[in-house]
Amino acid sequence: MRRLVLAAAVLLALPCAPAIAQTRIPEAALRQAAQLREQALADDTGWKVTESLTTEIGPRIAGSEADARAVAWAKAKFEQLGFDKVWTEPVTFPKWERRAEKAEVLGAHAQPLTITALGGSPGGTVQGEVVRFADLAALQAAPDGSLAGKIAFVDYQMTASRDGKDYGNGGAIRSRGPSAAIRKGAIGYVMRSAGTDSHRVPHTGITRFDEGLAPVPAAALSVPDANQLARLVERGPTRIRIALDCGWDGQATSYNVIGEITGREKPKEVVVIGGHLDSWDLGTGAVDDAAGVGITMAAGHLIGQLGQAPKRTIRVVAFANEEQGLYGGKAYAEAHGKDAADMKRHQIGAESDFGAGRIYAFNTGSANPAASREATAQIAQALAPLGIEYQPGKGGPGPDISPIAAKGAAWAWLAQDGSDYFHLHHTADDTLDKIDPKALAQNVAAYTVFAYLAAEAEGDFGSEFKAVTPPQE
């Protein structure tokens, strides 16, 4: 007993550690969110916006005439949907153009190959013997000079999964493979597309050439054509010709297009949601990323239709030129993440940019996640009827949110089912018919609930300014 009394006395004598102030969401807001959730499931605004962008604009590679029309479209759509404020912010970047592309097998087994130039590839015509590598590591391990006068072929088959994790390998082969090939002496580069389909539609995407290297033509083969080329190489020495008409053409300026539903109590504090407005030029950019634009515009619109404005401002951003290097996201972070005051105005941010599959998981993150743990759990509970699981410790910011998250902004992760995303990603098959309207509505409901509750929270989600360089890609 004496020991218990002594222990109690010691504890009373210790200085009290300050309790972490917990961000919470009022019950009235949770009730309103439940109504919004059901309303969003029955609403077709997200579908209509996605259909409009893909039909009226179509492919919209950054810096193109179609990209400029997409900017005008986004401004008009925000206004049509009743956003209080609509404006644009300039984003400048190098302009890359695709004009023509062709490849063929030469010699006794002559036949065409279905390819597409990788974004950032130079134009030119090369022909030579193909040397096949199973993956990027095998190419990097090849002896220096061993590919002199030859064309490197990296034949890695991506595996489909809900979280798309194998894109880490496929994307690296696309972005780093050409430079690795040049270092070994190659005059050209082809890769099995970074995709999980079996259709004769190649997947494009941006590539990079390391400083000091002379770029060479670089292209992706469709999956069936990669299989065909691999079989030919197995039979014996195989020569191919690649002819690309593409390349950089000066600088271009596009725009982040921003719409806001102004907050009633803290209008300078913002919940940021969005998708990217640009697409590659092969398909109509439906799953990548008209869906994200449609989902987040619709979420903002539904919140704006409430009789009472949200406590904080809902800011929806249609980001410029995500595809070629997060230019819109980096420009946004530069303009709106300059200092601690800027960062404190950012309650939290999330981007929809992984197709239109159903959202299956949710989490938030920041420099101080403990303070918002209760609010995050409350949002997760409101999302649970949509089939969304709370996964603490998982996830990360979306691509265009990552630059401002790197500077300290809190982020939310609404994980979309990407099981078939890489069947379509960056291909001519990325078209509206691949989107399930019911799955799209579930996404709209999730973003509406999340954005509204984050805006209504009593407290913040831990945004704290950090003076760091945003990620490059």
Model-derived regions, located:
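Noncatalytic luminal/extracellular "stalk/propeptide" segments of secretory-pathway proteins
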Residues: 23-24, 28-34, 51, 55-163
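Alpha-helical metal-binding/catalytic segments enriched in His/Glu/Asp
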Residues: 79, 173-174, 181, 257, ...
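Active-site-adjacent substrate-binding region
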Residues: 182, 188, 192-193, 252, ...
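Soluble metallo-hydrolase cores and metallopeptidase-like ectodomains found primarily
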Residues: 30-32, 108-144, 207-286, 298-301, ...
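N-terminal capping segment at the start of a domain
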Residues: 25, 30-64, 201-206, 278, ...
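Extracellular/luminal Protease-associated
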Residues: 64, 113-217, 284, 390
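Second-shell loop/turn segments in exported
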Residues: 33-41, 55-65, 117, 128-133, ...
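Metal-dependent peptidase/peptidase-like ectodomains
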Residues: 108-110, 123, 128, 216-218, ...
